[in-house]
């Protein structure tokens, strides 16, 4: 028990130190990495988990709800791709649409935003209790979720912002799971059919609505 408490204490300390570092140096580091990247792909909402080809960000300097952050850090139409895993459900409906429009502005024509959110049509009552607004998963007091999306409502949100939507994973109203193959090199979604470790023995314990929101353009961004 003592060891467990000490490990928790160390994790909290590391988290606090990382937050201090990000507040002081994160924006400078982000600018340097972005300037050096031949393909400009960034992750929003997760500074700790990202693939090597992607540049992480932090809301201290690139908050989806603060357009001035984006204007200070980026030029419109300059990004090849964005990735947001389990971010949009933390935004109010008004914030969600405004954030989608921000992403549309800063993507190149043909660029894309890969999004994953909890699936409001997942057939497991336990899953829904975890992910619904005000719900609480294991070890959580509350999940901080504002909206529980389905494939229809999430797709409509991004279409309303001007995107063309490609759905990859979702449950439908009849409880059937739909899957279209997607390349993790184009943005790994960890809470998905293939990559979530809770999905064992053919049982889909935790999945997401996964889609690409593509900004229309003459040439779609290369995905490699």
Predicted regions and their residues:
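S-adenosyl-L-methionine-dependent methyltransferase catalytic module, highlighting the catalytic core
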Residues: 95-104, 108, 112-220
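Conserved SAM-binding loop
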Residues: 39-125, 211-215
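Short, flexible hinge/linker loops that cap or flank conserved catalytic cores
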Residues: 35-36, 48, 203-204
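Short N-terminal helix-initiation segments at or just after the protein's N-terminus
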Residues: 20-31, 89, 148-158
